[in-house]
Amino acid sequence: MKKVLAGIVILLLNGCAMDPDLAPSDIEKATTTVDAVEGSTEQDSGLIDMLRRREDPQAGDPAWNPIRPQAKPEHYATATGSLFSSIQAQDLYDDTKPRGIGDIVTVMLEEKTQAKKSASSDLDKSTDLSMDPLVLGGKPLTIGDRDLSYEVANANKFSGTTSADQSNSIKGSISVEVIDVLANGNLMIRGEKWLTLNTGDEYIRVSGTIRPDDISQENTIESTRITNARIQYSGTGNRQDVQEQGWLANFFNVSL
């Protein structure tokens, strides 16, 4: 009896493992452990990448693939049996703003930030102690050939200053796709642009959440209206590497 029960349990477990509903979807298979903007967070085992402590993003990353809406057959019926679909329907006097997955919107990059910080600290401390020679009977009191007097002086001074001034600006445009529609109607967007130059590649990546009401009639939206925005403009290759300190220079520049 125990053998029969054990066999039934094994068959049930095998059936669950073969259930197509539990199998990973095509989207999960194509998804990599890639950050939304900065690229792969997995370190390469190569010596160069280990010393650089970073890995360049790559064009054609599956995590940044274009979103392709599912194609509908030429003749189809909705769940209600009607040919009319309220999701795809558009009013006669309605605008053509993006509202669905795969729609395109142009982001106008207008970012400018500036930060300044300065601090200073001064510490000054001094101590002076002295005692005149003791006089006893009109004569200085001595021990041997030394009189009983002392003089002590101590001074301690510290001064430290620090300042930081950082500013950046970016101006341009990039077209991105709607990758998800939230329950409140907000749109999640994502997109990238790669430029191949003579000495390397440059890329722009943008992701975040926008409101359809903020999209203009020209199908554009300002980057300052993107919430949870992640904007990256950088490059790859040797030209980018020379702008960063090497691992040995960083080692000697550590503050002790």
Curated annotation (Swiss-Prot):
GO cellular component: bacterial-type flagellum basal body, distal rod, L ring; cell outer membrane
One example GO MF annotation: cytoskeletal motor activity
Gene Ontology BP annotations: bacterial-type flagellum-dependent cell motility
Topological category with respect to the lipid bilayer: Lipid-anchor
Keywords in alphabetical order: Bacterial flagellum, Cell outer membrane, Lipoprotein, Membrane, Palmitate, Signal
Residues covalently joined to lipid (N-palmitoyl cysteine): C16
UniProt subcellular location: Cell outer membrane; Bacterial flagellum basal body
Lipidation (S-diacylglycerol cysteine): C16
Tree of life domain: Bacteria
Membrane found in the keyword field: yes
One Pfam family named in its UniProt record: FlgH
Signal sequence residues: 1-15
Free-text function comment from the UniProt entry: Assembles around the rod to form the L-ring and probably protects the motor/basal body from shearing forces during rotation.
Subunit structure: The basal body constitutes a major portion of the flagellar organelle and consists of four rings (L,P,S, and M) mounted on a central rod.
Family label: Belongs to the FlgH family.
NCBIfam families, A to Z: PRK00249.1-2
Protein name: Flagellar L-ring protein
Species for this entry: Photobacterium profundum (strain SS9)
Gene: flgH
